[in-house]
From Swiss-Prot:
<dbReference type="InterPro" id="IPR044142">
    <property type="entry name" value="AhpF_NTD_N"/>
</dbReference>
<keyword id="KW-0560">Oxidoreductase</keyword>
<dbReference type="InterPro" id="IPR044141">
    <property type="entry name" value="AhpF_NTD_C"/>
</dbReference>
<dbReference type="GO" id="GO:0016668">
    <property type="term" value="F:oxidoreductase activity, acting on a sulfur group of donors, NAD(P) as acceptor"/>
</dbReference>
<keyword id="KW-0274">FAD</keyword>
<dbReference type="GO" id="GO:0000302">
    <property type="term" value="P:response to reactive oxygen species"/>
</dbReference>
<feature type="disulfide bond" description="Redox-active">
    <location>
        <begin position="335"/>
        <end position="338"/>
    </location>
</feature>
<comment type="subunit">
    <text>Homodimer.</text>
</comment>
<dbReference type="InterPro" id="IPR008255">
    <property type="entry name" value="Pyr_nucl-diS_OxRdtase_2_AS"/>
</dbReference>
<dbReference type="InterPro" id="IPR012336">
    <property type="entry name" value="Thioredoxin-like_fold"/>
</dbReference>
<dbReference type="InterPro" id="IPR036188">
    <property type="entry name" value="FAD/NAD-bd_sf"/>
</dbReference>
<dbReference type="InterPro" id="IPR050097">
    <property type="entry name" value="Ferredoxin-NADP_redctase_2"/>
</dbReference>
<comment type="similarity">
    <text>Belongs to the class-II pyridine nucleotide-disulfide oxidoreductase family.</text>
</comment>
<dbReference type="Pfam" id="PF13192">
    <property type="entry name" value="Thioredoxin_3"/>
</dbReference>
<protein>
    <recommendedName>
        <fullName>Alkyl hydroperoxide reductase subunit F</fullName>
        <ecNumber>1.8.1.-</ecNumber>
    </recommendedName>
</protein>
<dbReference type="InterPro" id="IPR012081">
    <property type="entry name" value="Alkyl_hydroperoxide_Rdtase_suF"/>
</dbReference>
<keyword id="KW-0521">NADP</keyword>
Length: 507
């Protein structure tokens, strides 16, 4: 089931195993069970440290990744290929005794959790944000014997996932726990375990502190580090919103990559320099004093720096119409690559006629029964090549001059109301899912009145990426820069870094 290149890479990774690992599989006579057995046999044959046995488990087909004679609580229900293959490889290494890369403080938090925690995560193999959650919960299961975790492929266990309309969907002890991308710190926080602020107490002031972890942040950090400046990053995750991007084909010199690969490469590049990257933590306030610029973190710690570059990016913009908020993850979705497979053979709408919306409609048309694309303006704004492709599809309708007014449904989406602005008539369209693709909302709510914002909530900057506060710079999608592109954000990050360097020299 694995191609030659992947087998070669896997064989090298399996050499990092530090102990024996046993696959315990629950298999039937169905096709998926046969595929799973083929995969596990193929992997087992690649290392003398791996073995395969069979046993009846809660779900079939599924398998646990155990140490000989010891259950670890790590289970995969389905066939973990696609984006989840890395989750399987990582689980094998960690169960074998390979030390995780998490900070010791995080490991201690996991060890100190009291109680029994049985997690189940519904995923799709095309979901790019699912592996983060799966890998976090698998690691927690390996570290703490009171924690178990099962990854469940919704495409294989359709009855169980019938009412799952957004992935990853995490359940704890049978109750809904959370949806969407979560870091291991997010999970610990939801369990009531707070991060220790003591590790930040003795940090020396920075020359440049960058808030955010996306392309602008990474570019800025590398540029300032190369200038010999003491550089820090405070971010929820390296890569930012790019982690949720499927294909990237317009980053010059790289013909094609994915958001996950891009983010991984960005993190590796940052690691090559003396950059203090503090991930899994968010900033909650910023203040300029006579002595320094102070950034307060969500754990109460305060970091000081001569300059700060704000590069917190942007998140999905919502419709802000009745019914939307309460039906998010219950039919209202923002990621067609993640959640599209959950709407197979169903009717959906895409809101937004720009490149993102049209690309989403094209992708979904190959999965769902029917797509209706809504655009507020009189014509689509997407590139012509995308519009031509969209109009060639037989299961897509396009509605322009359409103002969406209400998401309809109680426990899940059943329809959408919209106004035809050319006639004033209101209509109800029955459907199962709505994918919102109307642009981005800057992550600036934490700034309060610290710097000047425009009417859209974006940070106002000049050509040197200065804000209205000397020493505080901003770059990327969080700013009022018109075009929001990865390559433009990276250029903006570099520009902000060079001007921060110049500011330090002159002050």
């Amino acid at each position: 089931m694995l191609n030659a290149d992947l087998k070669q890479q896997l064989k090298q990774l399996l050499e990092l195993m530090e102990g024996n690992v046993e696959f315990v599989a629950s298999l039937g006579s169905d096709e998926k069970s046969k595929e799973l057995k083929e995969l596990l046999t193929e992997i087992s044959d690649m290392s003398p440290r791996l073995s395969l046995s069979e046993k009846s488990l809660k779900r079939t087909p599924s398998f646990s990744v155990n140490r000989p004679g010891e259950e670890t609580g790590v289970t995969f229900a389905g066939i973990p290929l696609g984006h989840e293959f890395n989750s399987l490889v990582l689980a094998i290494l960690q169960v074998s005794g390979r030390a995780p890369k998490e900070k010791q403080s995080i490991i201690d938090q996991i060890k100190n959790l009291e109680g029994s925690f049985h997690f189940e995560t519904f995923i799709s193999l095309t979901c790019q944000k699912c592996p983060d959650v799966v890998q976090a919960l698998n690691l927690m299961s390996v570290i703490n014997p009171n924690i178990t975790h099962s990854m469940i492929d919704g495409a294989v266990f359709r009855e169980e996932s019938e009412n799952i309309m957004a992935v990853p969907a995490v359940f704890l002890n049978g109750e809904e726990f959370g949806n969407g991308r979560m870091t291991i710190q997010d999970i610990l926080s939801k369990l009531g375990s707070t991060a220790d602020a003591s590790e930040f107490e003795n940090k020396e002031p920075y020359d440049v502190l960058i808030v955010g972890g996306g392309p602008a942040s990474g570019s800025a950090a590398i540029y300032t580090a190369r200038k010999g400046l003491r550089t820090g990053i405070v971010a929820d995750r390296i890569g930012g919103q790019v982690n949720d991007t499927a294909g990237i084909e317009n980053f010059i010199t790289v013909k094609e990559t994915t958001g996950s690969e891009f983010s991984s490469n960005l993190a590796a590049h940052i690691d090559q320099y003396d950059i203090d990257a503090m991930t899994g933590i968010r900033a909650t306030d910023i203040e300029k004093t006579d002595e320094a610029i102070k950034v307060t973190l969500e754990n109460g710690a305060v970091l000081e720096s001569k300059t700060v570059i704000i590069a917190t990016g942007a998140g999905w913009r919502k419709l802000n119409i009745p019914g939307e908020e309460q039906l998010i993850n219950k039919g209202v979705a923002f990621c067609p690559h993640c959640d599209g497979p959950l709407f197979e053979n169903k009717d959906v709408a895409v809101i937004g006629g720009g490149n993102s919306g049209v690309e989403a409609a094209i992708d979904l048309a190959g999965i769902v029964n029917h797509v209706t694309l809504f655009e507020f303006a009189s014509e689509l704004k997407a590139d012509n090549v995308l519009q031509d492709r969209l109009r060639s599809l037989s299961n897509v309708d396009i509605k322009t001059n359409a103002k969406t007014t209400e998401v309809v449904g109680e426990d899940h989406v059943t329809g959408i109301r919209y106004e035809d602005m050319s006639t004033g008539e209101e209509h109800l369209l029955n459907l199962d899912g709505i994918f919102v693709q109307i642009g981005l909302l800057p992550n600036t709510s934490w700034l309060k009145d610290a710097v000047e914002l425009n009417e859209r909530g974006e940070i106002v900057i000049d050509c040197n990426n200065n804000t209205n506060v000397p020493g505080i710079f901003a770059a990327g999608d969080v700013t009022d820069q018109k075009n929001k592109q990865i390559i433009i954000s990276m250029g903006a990050g570099a520009n902000a870094a060079l001007n921060a360097f110049d500011y330090i020299i002159r002050n």
